């Protein structure tokens, strides 16, 4: 039951927001009693912490798999991003803004873990991209890691990319494209354009 609560809470927090979605809402949606919920999670803060642990386990600890698949490293990243989109059911940065505002310690812990995850992801990405002959050899790795992580954090700051002007997933995929454009050589550019065409045709 505890894991079921965490999974459902993650889905609803991502959809409605960490502050907006209440414990009463969760009880109602799951059809369980308040007693059952509070036996497992005495406070909403406890639930938010458990949800973060679960989300980090799903994303950060499996970061190596993000570049894996049957296609090129570029295609694999796009395909795996689609899987993330389906799993987390998130369509706005609002949940992250609420987490930062109302659960600041949890947010800070998330930022630390994501920074570590970003660094591991870049290592795996570059390793595979170089092996496939798609990336430039003269990349300043430390600078790129800092740049990548900083832009990811900047994206989550409210009003940096106003969602009325820059829809959430359009922003995500535009950033992915630009991150790759910095890395690719001539061969990699052709592959990136091929993958973008697949995505535009909804084949990814």
Residue ranges and their predicted role:
Residues 1-10, 26, 51-55, 59, ...:
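Generic hydrophobic, amphipathic alpha-helix propensity
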Residues 4, 12-46, 50:
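Helix-turn-helix
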Residues 44, 51, 55, 59, ...:
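Hydrophobic/aromatic residues within well-ordered alpha-helical segments
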Residues 50, 64-91, 145:
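Hydrophobic alpha-helical connector segments
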Residues 51, 55, 59, 63, ...:
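Hydrophobic recognition helices of helix-based DNA-binding modules
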Residues 78, 123, 141-149, 169, ...:
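Short, well-structured alpha-helical segments
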Residues 89-123, 130-138, 142-143:
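Short secondary-structure transition hinges
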Residues 124-128, 165-204:
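C-terminal peripheral helix-coil segments that are non-catalytic and often amphipathic
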């Amino acid at each position: 039951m505890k894991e079921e609560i965490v999974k459902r809470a993650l889905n609803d927090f991502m959809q409605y927001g960490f502050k907006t979605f209440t414990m009463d809402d969760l009880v109602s949606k799951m059809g369980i009693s308040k007693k059952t919920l509070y036996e497992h999670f005495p406070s909403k803060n406890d639930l938010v912490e458990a949800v973060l642990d679960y989300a980090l386990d799903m994303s950060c600890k499996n970061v190596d798999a993000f570049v894996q698949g049957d296609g090129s490293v570029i295609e694999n990243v796009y395909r795996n991003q689609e899987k993330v989109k389906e799993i987390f059911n998130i369509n706005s940065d609002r949940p992250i803004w609420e987490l930062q505002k109302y659960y600041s310690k949890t947010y800070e812990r998330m930022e630390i873990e994501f920074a570590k995850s970003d660094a591991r992801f870049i290592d795996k990405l570059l390793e595979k991209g170089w092996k496939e002959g798609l990336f430039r050899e003269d990349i300043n790795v430390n600078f790129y890691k800092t740049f990548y992580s900083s832009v990811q954090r900047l994206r989550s700051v409210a009003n940096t990319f106003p969602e009325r002007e820059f829809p959430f997933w359009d922003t995500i995929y535009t950033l992915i494209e630009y991150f790759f454009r910095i890395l690719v050589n001539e061969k990699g550019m052709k592959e990136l354009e091929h993958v973008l065409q697949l995505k535009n045709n909804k084949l990814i």
